[in-house]
Amino acid sequence: NMANSLGYSVFLSTFEKQKAYLQGVGKNHPLVFVSLHIAEEFSDTYTKDMHAMCAWLNEEGFRIVADVSTKSLELFQVSSVREIAKLLDVYALRLDYGFNHAEMLALAKEMPIVLNASTIRVDEVEDLVREGKEILAMHNYYPRSETGLDEEYFLRITKSLQDAGIHVIAFIPGDVLKRGPIFEGLPTLEHHRHISPYAAFMELTLKYHVDQVFVGDPGISTYEIERIQSYCDTGVIDIPATLKHAEHFYDKEVTCRIDSPSWIIRVEEARLLKKVDEHIVPNNTITREVGAITMDNDAYLRYAGEVQIVRSPLPADNRVNIIGHVSPKDLSIL
């Protein structure tokens, strides 16, 4: 299953800086996206540098998804993209403009191919899906603020592609070393632009059921990579929070009650964690904002010790103490 690991984007211009965190990440054979037609990267040593970069990535265990256009053919002085694929030892090709249907079909029989999710017409690629090895559709990333996709369009396109048997790929922003010249993140969805990579990954995976997630930016912190990998390995969701009034809850694994209403998450184990004769005095009984972590105090009688995480704003209640807060960049996980 592809969603078992995060994909990365590697750029020639930032490759030396990216090596540091990519070292050792390749052991699960994650996919890595490399574009072979970024005009500002072209130089006299372009093909040599690209060759060296791809060799390193393959050596480390990554599987390369190369974005090719007819421009790439000129650069590498070859007559077909198949030759580029062999030359750089790529796993899959993303075909943008400039390729006709017959070429695509021939390639699809040999290797996974990736098409542009926004321009693909499902009825035109039925034969590719039927006869090809694997057909994927990749949403774009959007460097300029306010140009990322809205939720409704994204969901509609994603679902129609998946219904046709096509795996869907989308991008999340990084949190360090963002891609220039705008430096505002490379998400597919606009509302992911300023949240944590982890929260964006979780939403794409759990809410939108995307098959594969790539980081669009060249940089993502080891902290975020580890959180994402940990979810992929264990299925446990990590919720960063500050717990000023309940330090003993840090690093505890808890279960969300399956019957939690949409406005709160009820923690299943909470009342069990309370000692029989423990008193919970009213404290910090203020308005419950989104992300507030609450504990019912003694005034709530047998509910004393009940712990909840707030998903929609609720009024203050003198029986409910606020014991902490989910970190702002991770609120969408809720």
Model feature map: region roles:
Residues N116-L243:
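Catalytic alpha/beta core domains of metabolic enzymes, predominantly
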Residues N1-M2, T205:
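Short, flexible, solvent-exposed loop/turn segments with mixed acidic/basic and small polar residues
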Residues A66-V81, Y97-L105, E152-R156, L206-V215, ...:
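Electropositive, surface-exposed helix/loop patches at the edges of structured domains
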Residues T242-L334:
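C-terminal functional modules
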Residues A3-R130, E134:
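Active-site beta->alpha loop and helix N-cap motifs at the rims of alpha/beta catalytic domains
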Residues S9, M138, P240, Q308-V310:
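Residues in well-ordered beta-strands of folded domains
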Residues Q18, F76, T147, I225, ...:
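Short acidic, gly/pro-rich beta-turn/loop elements at beta-sheet edges
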